[in-house]
């Protein structure tokens, strides 16, 4: 059974807004290493759309946006290659190596956890809260 790990960047005062911190090289290196330890990522709609719009273009075209430093490329390539499951009742279509996780959330995630592998990672705020309420998160990283 593979574990479900929750990882989020949070400030000491409890802020989880990605715009409230400076994403430095060490943070991106750690994030790429963390993602490489997972077989798949679980995203809610908001996190999926945020990550897809920010990281997919560079990984696919090799052209970095003006805001992206060269040391961000390994993270972009790692997250681009990762398998993704998206929980959403409003999105009609996903790609980016992703598929929908539909039906009962608890049952669907339990099925994923029962598969062999290194583990699953979830980020964001709403989906992890629901998973925590179901008792499905095995490890927390802040």
Feature-to-residue mapping (PLM):
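Portal/gating segments that form or line small-molecule/metal binding sites
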Residues: 1-142
